Amino acid sequence: VECDYLNQIIGKEKLSGYTANIAFTGFTAPKILWVKNKEPENFARIRKIMLPKDYIAYQLSGVHCTDVSDASGMLLLDVKHRKWSPEMLEICGVTEEQMAKVYESYETVGNVLPEIAKELDIPETVRIVAGAGDNAAAAVGTGTVGDGRCNISLGTSGTIFISSEKFGVDRNNALHAFAHADGHYHLMGCMLSAASCNKWWMEEIVGTGDYAAEQKDIEKLGENHVFFLPYLMGERSPHNNPNARGTFIGMTMDTSRTDMTQAVLEGVA
């Protein structure tokens, strides 16, 4: 409901202008609106809004902080200028004072608190840095920082990540436009169910969890006429639809379990 309000009433064009993105169910802004609409008593108690890693940094340093890459996925950040969007904060009914200070990922936010240093038996000179979102951090680790560099990551979800020196927005908003390292930006497509599809199929349906044996059987197959749409948790890219559902297509009486296993793998690929 909150995503529909943002995308349809506020409008995708305005959202994209404010934040370089449109509303997805996983983003923070629609969640804030949900709390505002459903739990106004809790909304009134909000002092600071932080992402999980930022809360850990706060506990270690006492500093309310976030970084540009992770904050990009909140739908509250003016990604182009790497600062909070006043328009989005107003739409959500929160103030900049309720938000954490935005840092570049590599920046030091402070030193570890003395009491934490004592408890963990580490020097008080240990620095706490802002950090990064998972895909942005992985991209730095794989060298996906230079202009035009790309990586593909398959885990529970699947992502295609493209680094760019220049700010740009996908005209269809099918890709996320986020801040990246070294003052760069990145475009990212996120498929919500990737390797998790294979895990679901093997453990819940096949019931063996014997991936190696199933892979060996698939190697004997050729062209497969069974197709699988891997929308087990809705979808983000290229179709923003939380209600999308997974489907097998093209099944006949001759369809085997191995055909369906191959379809699951090919559907993700």
Regions found by a protein language model. Name each.
Residues 4-64, 75-86, 90-93, 114-269:
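Active-site core segments that coordinate phosphate-bearing ligands/cofactors
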Residues 67-71:
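Nucleotide/phosphate-binding loop and acidic/charged catalytic motifs
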Residues 1:
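A charged helix-plus-loop insertion that forms the helical arch/lid used to bind
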Residues 97-103, 127-129:
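General small-molecule cofactor/ligand-binding pocket signal
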